[in-house]
Amino acid sequence: MDQDTQHEISRLFAVVDDFAEDMKARLSEQAIKGYRGWDDPANYRRILTMMMEHASVAAGQEVDAANLAMILWYLRKQSEL
């Protein structure tokens, strides 16, 4: 792999790491508030709707939308087991 490509990948990974830290902080805030049920497949549709609402607002909602997308990804993966 050439140096430019490696540099680009390193930059992307650094941004993902920073974003993941914000995601974790927000998930912690929500857990402290008492939010539960994220891993319950029965909540899939509700979480999907919430994600679409956060994504449509976009500005300032990126972390929440990403967390909801992560939860949907997890639920889908669990259903494939």
Across the structure, where does each feature detected by a protein language model lie?
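Flexible "arm" and connector segments at domain edges
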Residues: M1-L81
